[in-house]
Amino acid sequence: WYFWGNHFTISDTQTLGSYSTGAYQREFLRANMDKNFETMVTEATLAWPMIMHLDNKDNVGPKSESGRSEWRKREKEPATINENHARELMELHTISPDGGYTQQDVIELAKVMTGWRPKWTKGRDHGHDVKFDRERHEPGKKQVLGKVYKSGKKGINLAIKDLVNHPSCREF
């Protein structure tokens, strides 16, 4: 499990005190070590500590329902695509820095990943389960490494499947 803990790493920095690495290793990495790589990547990508660590909780599609909401305009808090998690998914978890992706591929994968966030619990600033929030998901088709993904919840699973089957992933 030590290898996978380094491959799908998170840290106790930022607000991750309660999103501890121990819980992450126990609940996600160790629980999936006997699964195939695609399952491991999917489970690690959609794990609440990884979503928090790589800021996908802040990944809101500008054209999404939430992104176009009046309160964002009133409070001057525009919705933004957060590329951090998408870049790490390609660069560190699947196809490597030499995988042939472009900055546009990172942006498009980040759009695929919009809407995935922890389920918040009332009175607390974090959650322990993950949900897909359609209101925060960027609508429309996205193209990553030449493959087109429809809008919606299934996009992340299809994108991960394509990334783990990419020739660069096998070499990485």
Predicted regions, residues:
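Active-site substrate-binding loop specific to GH73 endo-beta-N-acetylglucosaminidase modules
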Residues: 18-172
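Peptidoglycan glycan-strand catalytic modules in the bacterial/periplasmic cell-wall system
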Residues: 1, 5-14, 21-28
